[in-house]
Amino acid sequence: MAADETNLIWVDLEMTGLEPEVDRIIEIATIVTDKELNILAEGPVIAIHQSEDVLAAMDDWNQKHHGESGLIDRVRASDFSEQDAIEQTIAFLSEHVPAGVSPMCGNSIGQDRRFLNRYMPTLEDYFHYRNIDVSSVKELVRRWRPEVMDGFKKQGTHQALVDIQESIAELRYYREKVFKI
């Protein structure tokens, strides 16, 4: 499939916490959709190796959720560095979307962009500067059409690939119920 400028890149990161100055990326996943939100391809899901010191510094919430999901064990067993994740992700994306044209798509994507800017700037540069942030749409729906909110439920697995799939489904839901386009 040729790279298409109208395709959208969806990304999700799992991190050891919320502060890019001290916390690290431990998982990355990407999906490419067409402009109608149809999934065209799922990229690699990469657990990124981090030191025991980095993992031990996680707060209780992250220890619990990433422990229960098995992500901590996958991170410990992983041979992938941040650089490996950058290279594999860009190789995947370049097959579907030219550099610099797709907004970064996802939920609370500004947070992911902060971590990419700090630890994976080459990958962050692959995106257009604009974002398609499903959480912004959700906040508007909560205020303008609160009755619509109960119609979509997420699993909340905090697994990168599942989170992206849910974000795409959530935006489809809002498009159908709110935007009607």
Curated annotation (Swiss-Prot):
Active site: Y129
GO molecular function, a single term: nucleic acid binding
Enzyme class, spelled out: hydrolase
Gene3D superfamilies: Ribonuclease H-like superfamily/Ribonuclease H (3.30.420.10)
Keywords: Cytoplasm, Exonuclease, Hydrolase, Nuclease
Domain Exonuclease residue range list: 8-171
Gene Ontology CC: one annotated term: cytoplasm
EC number(s) recorded for this UniProt protein: 3.1.15.-
Pfam families: RNase_T
Subcellular location: Cytoplasm
GO biological process: DNA metabolic process
Role description: 3'-to-5' exoribonuclease specific for small oligoribonucleotides.
Similarity comment text for this entry: Belongs to the oligoribonuclease family.
Full protein name: Oligoribonuclease
Species the sequence originates in: Shewanella loihica (strain ATCC BAA-1088 / PV-4)
UniProt gene name: orn
